[in-house]
Regions:
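Conserved N-terminal beta1-alpha1 strand-loop-helix module at the mouth
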Residues: 65-135, 143-145, 300, 304
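N-terminal secretory signal peptides
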Residues: 1-28, 50-52
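C-terminal segment of N-terminal export signals and the immediately downstream linker at the start
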Residues: 23-24, 44-78
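Hydrophobic faces of well-ordered beta-strands that scaffold small-molecule active sites
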Residues: 79-85, 108-110, 136-140, 161-163, ...
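Conserved anion-binding
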Residues: 156-239
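Catalytic cores of alpha/beta
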Residues: 145-153, 205-215, 267-282
Length: 323
């Protein structure tokens, strides 16, 4: 049974519709509806009386934020490419990022070496100033103090913080709480949280899938399947085999309809094309620039970096999904 909406003034009905569908925030709704609060019925209660009178509780949904939702939908359904700017200096980092953007990347990742060498409070504002329209991700590899680190990224103009899923649900929730705070403060900038699942450490596949589910339950927006750089340098079989691809497919098959799944860690063009045919859409270009080895190529001239990046994007985007 639903409460009688006809007993409410039309102005209240209009306010409720606007609140439910996004044009006004909670504060504006309460201010407007407060004019109609009578008999001890608060504006908040007015809003509650407009909801269906159902006893079946629904799980709490994430707060909607249109700018963030658009990015997530793109990551899930369209080809997106991220460059990991894993260098030590701001000068080189800016040059690599500019070349990659010219090559067509969707997201610029301020890599962990750059953030640790130069400092978050220096790198993030510098990249935002130079690349005002770019989606900026900070690969913080956070293991604790998640709220503090997320605040530094968002305050500097970053769009996405990437932390280690190994940190657990409490850190994930702390980061997501700060994300939500910044979303409420501004509608224009996307604010997202990605969790990196480090493999082989967090393998095998069954364990990695469980971790992915826990991260989504904690509120993160997307997960990355990240082949650890030390591991792939120590064991060449991780590169020669399709270990990363197998892990990524397993996770994508289980959560890919619910959230974007990125593939990270020395990804080659051939691997990325195979994953694209399996339906995956979010890829990270590492220092090897899509070549089937572990050699970093960020010391190449910018025009060469741009050529490698553009080639990676063109090759992978042309892969047809298997039916």
């Amino acid at each position: 049974m639903e409460r009688n909406k006809a007993s409410r003034p039309q102005e209240v009905l209009d306010l409720v519709h606007e609140r439910q569908h996004g044009p006004i925030d909670r504060r504006s709704f309460l201010h407007g509806a407060g004019r109609f609060a009578v008999g001890g019925l608060t504006a908040g209660a007015v809003f509650q009386t407009m909801r269906p009178n159902s006893v079946s509780a629904q799980p709490a949904a994430k707060e909607t934020h249109a700018a963030s939702a658009r990015v997530l939908e793109r990551l899930r359904t369209r080809f997106t490419f991220q460059i990991s700017v894993d260098v030590a200096t701001l000068e080189q980092g800016r040059a690599v990022a500019a070349a990659a953007l010219a090559g067509g990347v969707t997201i610029v990742e301020m890599g962990t070496p750059l953030l640790k060498n130069q400092g978050v409070s220096n790198v993030v504002p510098a990249f935002r100033t130079q690349f005002p329209e770019a989606l900026l991700l900070a690969d913080m590899k956070t293991m604790d103090g998640g709220g503090f680190e997320a605040r530094a990224v968002y305050a500097g103009g970053g769009n996405i913080i990437d932390f280690l899923a190994l940190a657990g649900a409490d850190t994930a929730k702390a980061i997501c709480a700060v994300r939500d705070e910044f979303r409420r403060a501004g509608a224009e900038l996307p604010r997202l949280v990605f969790a990196d699942i480090m493999v082989p450490h967090q393998g095998p596949a069954a364990q990695a899938i469980e971790v992915a589910h826990r991260m989504l339950e904690a509120g993160v927006d997307a997960v990355g399947v990240h082949l650890q750089s030390d591991a792939r340098r120590a064991d060449s079989k991780l590169i020669e085999s399709d270990y990363l691809g197998d892990m990524a497919r397993a996770i994508f098959e289980r959560i890919g309809k619910a959230a974007p799944v990125q593939v990270v860690g020395g990804l080659s063009i051939a691997q990325a094309k195979s994953l694209a045919r399996a339906g995956m859409r979010a890829f990270v270009i590492s220092g090897n620039l899509g070549q089937p080895d572990t050699r970093a190529r960020y010391d190449l001239p910018p025009a060469e970096i741009q050529r490698y990046v553009a080639g990676f994007i063109a090759e992978v985007s042309s892969a047809q999904q298997s039916q």
